Amino acid sequence: MASALSAGLIGKRCAASDVLVIVPGEAVRQRSQDQGTHTAAGVTPQLAQQRIWILAVKPQQMKEVLLQCQPYVKDDTLIISVAAGIAAQSIAKWLAVNGKPHNRIIRAMPNTPAFIGCGATGLMALAAVEPNDKLIAETVFKTVGEFVWVDNDQAIDAVTAL
């Protein structure tokens, strides 16, 4: 999904040099580099320079990845998670700084047709997410199809059935 999102962003919304893709897999990383995107094999201090993080991580890897990312999160960092079944409150807790959860979290659940730009994505935001953050998420997910905002974590997973 990270490949589909970065390709959509680069093709429609921003320059490849403005995107940092962290991908452990060499083949996917090479495809991103071929598009001109900045890439890294793992969490890097460069992450602290990015205000928007899109985490397209396998659910079983999410906690470990977030704990590695936690030192680089700032108050204004917008986290967009594309990991099935990982509650927004869990993400907020794993990114906590000094015991304070990081609540600028948007969950996104695109369905499979997003890979070809014809998908439907469910979006859900915690209360601390600002209106402009929602517009950013909408801009990202318009690149791979339609989107719909839902009210809670339970409703978001139903969107993948569309």
Place the predicted regions along the sequence by residue.
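NAD(P)+-binding Rossmann beta1-loop-alpha1 motif at the extreme N-terminus of oxidoreductases
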Residues: 1-42
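Phosphate- and divalent-cation-binding pockets in alpha/beta enzyme and binding domains
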Residues: 4, 31, 64-65, 90, ...
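Short conserved AdoMet
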Residues: 14-15, 74, 100, 142
